Amino acid sequence: MKKTILTVVLCVLTLNTALAQFDTAMFVSDVFLLDNYIKRQNNGINFKDTKTYRGTPYNNPNFLPGNIYKEGTLLADNIAIRYNAVADEMEVKQTLSSNDENARVLTKSQDIYVKIIEDIYVFVPYQGGVENGGYFQVIFEGGQIALYKKHIKEFIPEKKATSSITKTLPAVFKDKPVFYLVTKSGKFYQMPKSRSKKLKVFGEKQNQMKTFTKQYNLDLNKQEDLLTAVKYYDSL
């Protein structure tokens, strides 16, 4: 009888270990996938050699503490995460002091979201597929509407000096974020670059929004002012 109980316990422990390993594999891919993917996305730039370019291909060049959640349940706590905006990948390693070479790529899934310090990132599939989907930062989530931010990096290649009186200009990564209003049903409405056209996104309430933004002198091209306007819109 004791042997039977011991056998059952060992089987349960083995199964739990296997499930834990499987769960880990589900949200973290092989490290070589990360290395290969970055090489295809780096435009001939070595990301580690920061002297060769200006700006950063990342939202933040440093790994920061964060958590990973799956369907609202904590999956990984206080690990090191960095968002590669160029590759649209979440790079993950066990601790902040872990070697960057040990970083892995988080599996893209709409069921998994990331919190880096206080910033929340969600993965949104495109037409039901992962391939053309992407990560968005949740700036605000209200009762009726949410404000999402898509981090986009414009890459400007290095410009070699053409004469002795000119100098070589390093490659540049420029921030070109795009904001979206997101409805509860999951519809995305991109905010245009023009201030006046942004108001049209508010639809039937654009006149109220125009009055509000004028009253408080809000510049909808600035994230802080746009957030103020969206919060007001959500309250209407």
State what each model feature region is.
Residues 46-65:
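N-terminal ordered "arm"
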Residues 59-192:
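Aromatic-patch recognition
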Residues 17, 33, 109-111, 197, ...:
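Exposed alpha-helical structural elements
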Residues 1-25, 229:
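Bacterial Sec-dependent N-terminal signal peptides
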Residues 18-52:
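Sec-dependent signal peptide cleavage junction
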Residues 190-193, 199-236:
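Long, compositionally biased interface segments
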Residues 36-39, 180-184, 198-201:
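Short hydrophobic/aromatic-rich motifs at helix boundaries and adjacent loops
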